[in-house]
Amino acid sequence: MQNLPALLLFCGVVCSAYPVDRAAEDENNNMELTQQYLENYYNLGKDVKPFVRRRNSGPVVEKIREMQKFLGLEVTGKVDSDTLAMMRRPRCGVPDVGDFTTFPGMPKWRKTHLTYRIMNYTPDLPRDAVDSAIEKALNVWKEVTPLTFSRTDEGEADIKISFAVRDHGDFNPFDGPGNVLGHAYPPGPGIYGDAHFDDDEQWTSDTSGTNLFLVAAHELGHSLGLFHSADPSALMYPVYNVLADLARFHLSQDDVNGIQSLYGGPPSDSSNDPVVPTESVPPGPGTPAACDPTLSFDAISTLRGEFLFFKDRHFWRKSLRTLEPGFYLISSFWPSLPSGLDAAYEETSKDIVFIFKGNQFWAMRGTEVQAGYPKGIHTLGFPPTVKKIDAAVFDKEKKKTYFFVGDKYWRFDEKRQSMEPGFPKQIAEDFPGVDSKVDAAFEAFGFYYFFNGSSQLEFDPNAKKVTHVLKSNSWLNC
């Protein structure tokens, strides 16, 4: 036991030194993170590296201040806890330097119709979910510009989209899970215009992992010529912002201003624009209030990238172009339609909205009723016992329409124009958690939204489960 004092002395020295060593190691890691971040995103020269440990080094402090200002942090010139937390968040791999919302020289496409090709797929999602996320991401920019997009499955394309890990041949390697989510190149030939996504991330259609739609909409903004924005509410802000409710997604005014500085606004005379009154209906006695906590909807449909929520004689129109929904009379848009609709859905490939009331339905393109309508709902294949439709939703990936009646549903094949055999089925059987009658339904962002009274259920068709319970009027900013 004579060596015990020496052993205790040794342990005391080591143990007391350990926190100091750990603190020094943390400090070293923080400095390395800062150095790398400033080199990657703020053009800090690699020859400045010896100065990074000198806290008052002019080049480093100025770059830290530049970063803090751009990212909306308190400008201290010091690597404080907020700055460290921001640097550790997932983000885009495109640098932030510059006081502009477009790339230097404002590169842009010299045409308004662009092609895109999905070169490969992530194993994290079904192929149709990836296709849908990319299409929706491009539609975000299509809504506010004259740009149109078409997909090709072979040959060259203006924008090539791919998933890759680590070094993938563009001298801009990915870094594994977290940190850099993707990067893209400004308009031009060859690799320019292409968007790459780090396949070490866990890509999802919801917010349980990294949402592919949100990241793709950002990266494709780069493919169209946009640089990063210093506005934290902008889609083009470099750091990934998770939205608790994807239904509330909209472009910021900064995003709109940036893309329209390159391409202008959408053509006002486009046949693809809904013809809707420019002025909303003023609220008055007897008109439904958007933020009434008991508000329910008669029917809901999409229309050329917008959302229409029908109630009695009125409807709300929600667009990605504007934050606030408009409120209109149905008769001002569709003079021949009745009020108090039962169901509606858009068949996007035909540019037609089908609207149901009682035992009849109408096919509308723009404001025009199509020839031969209204028709009886039994021409679709419903039995005589079905007197009306409660709700309908079109799955544009499968080209199927789901019709809900009471606690059952039918499925209609839009390609074959016939009701599928084996129906009706119980709603709860194939839509677990959707146990009550469905008043209205539609599809958006890869989810089905089922409405009953003042509540709505967000349903993931891939996972076959309800992911959120929301108020029906959450789409109206309530």
UniProtKB/Swiss-Prot annotation:
Known cofactor(s): Ca(2+); Zn(2+)
UniProt keyword list: Calcium, Collagen degradation, Disulfide bond, Extracellular matrix, Glycoprotein, Hydrolase, Immunity, Innate immunity, Metal-binding, Metalloprotease, Protease, Repeat, Secreted, Signal, Zinc, Zymogen
Hemopexin repeats: 288-337, 338-384, 386-434, 435-478
Alphabetized SUPFAM superfamilies for the sequence: Hemopexin-like domain (SSF50923), Metalloproteases ('zincins'), catalytic domain (SSF55486), PGBD-like (SSF47090)
Similarity comment: Belongs to the peptidase M10A family.
Compositional bias annotation for Low complexity: 266-277
Chain residues that bind Zn(2+) 2: 92, 218, 222, 228
Subcellular location(s) per record: Secreted, Extracellular space, Extracellular matrix
Free-text function comment from the UniProt entry: Metalloproteinase with a rather broad substrate specificity that can degrade fibronectin, laminin, gelatins of type I, III, IV, and V; collagens III, IV, X, and IX, and cartilage proteoglycans. Activates different molecules including growth factors, plasminogen or other matrix metalloproteinases such as MMP9. Once released into the extracellular matrix (ECM), the inactive pro-enzyme is activated by the plasmin cascade signaling pathway. Also acts intracellularly.
ATP-binding is among the record's keywords: no
GO biological process assignments: cellular response to amino acid stimulus; cellular response to reactive oxygen species; cellular response to UV-A; collagen catabolic process; extracellular matrix organization; innate immune response; negative regulation of phosphatidylinositol 3-kinase/protein kinase B signal transduction; negative regulation of reactive oxygen species metabolic process
Source organism: Canis lupus familiaris
Listed name of the protein: Stromelysin-1
Lineage top rank: taxon: Eukaryota
Top-tier EC class: hydrolase
Cofactor note: Binds 4 Ca(2+) ions per subunit. Binds 2 Zn(2+) ions per subunit.
E.C. number(s) listed in UniProt: 3.4.24.17
Motif window: Cysteine switch: 90-97
